[in-house]
């Protein structure tokens, strides 16, 4: 349970989502 690692992963996902709107849709669905 590393909160820092989780935050880093979420931050990276957000960055990728911004670059790929299509992925953003998937991330939103999963979230």
Curated annotation (Swiss-Prot):
Name the UniProt record assigns to this protein: Uncharacterized protein 1
Region Disordered, residue ranges: 1-31
């Amino acid at each position: 349970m590393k909160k820092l690692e989780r935050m880093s992963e979420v931050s990276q996902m957000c960055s990728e989502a911004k670059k790929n709107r299509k992925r953003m849709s998937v991330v939103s669905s999963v979230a």
